[in-house]
């Protein structure tokens, strides 16, 4: 009975905190929406590949992020100065995957250097091959986890265009993708195999996408 009462008390304490966090997230997303719409209209961006209005697409985007809560991540892909819109779209998709992979690789490298160098590990020499392999494999694995949200295009006025493609990824799914990349990258690195448990811990940690 005592445990039950303690459990109820814990739930009562946690619930208001979760609700406050959700409201804070909602306010943040609303502000981002207003800022983005103002920016897009000012710079002449148009929605690409959708029958919806840009306003609706952006509202839907932030609604998806809100529903995912802390598990939702936005990933941006950029393509510049292209003439074929289809080619530009593929460039933006590839850029999103490459950007995410580079951020994932940089995060793990930073953690290895800061946490393991003090243990006498020569991070640069021992992990050099691993970093490159890990980024390459994350780029491959994350592509299947990115869900396209909306895409905008800008006419440069000289026959070329700029494109920004926005994707949403679930952090839990992204973590699994990074783990798959780690498992394969470790095959190319004796150091990653030797320190597998520690490196796996770094890979599982989330990081802020830019």
Which sequence ranges carry the predicted segments?
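Domain-level marker for long, solvent-exposed, non-transmembrane regions
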Residues: 20-210
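Sec-dependent N-terminal signal peptides
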Residues: 4-13
């Amino acid at each position: 009975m005592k445990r039950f009462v303690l459990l109820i008390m814990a739930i009562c304490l946690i619930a208001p905190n979760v609700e406050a966090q959700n409201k804070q997230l909602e306010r943040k997303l609303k502000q981002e929406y207003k800022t983005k719409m103002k920016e897009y209209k000012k710079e002449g961006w148009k929605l690409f590949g959708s029958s919806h209005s840009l306003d609706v697409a952006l509202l839907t985007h932030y609604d998806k992020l809100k529903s995912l809560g802390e598990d939702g991540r936005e990933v941006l892909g950029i393509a510049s100065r292209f003439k074929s819109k289809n080619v530009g779209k593929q460039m933006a998709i590839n850029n999103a995957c490459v950007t995410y992979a580079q951020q994932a690789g940089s995060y793990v490298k930073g953690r290895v250097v800061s946490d393991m160098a003090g243990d006498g590990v020569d991070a640069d020499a021992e992990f050099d091959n691993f970093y490159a392999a890990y980024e390459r494999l994350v780029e491959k694995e994350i592509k299947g986890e990115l869900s396209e949200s909306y895409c905008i295009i800008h006419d440069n006025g000289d026959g070329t265009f700029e494109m920004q493609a926005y994707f949403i990824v679930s952090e839990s799914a992204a973590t699994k993708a990074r783990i798959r990349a780690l498992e394969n990258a470790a095959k190319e690195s004796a150091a990653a195999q030797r320190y597998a448990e520690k490196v796996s811990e770094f890979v599982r940690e989330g990081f802020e996408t830019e």
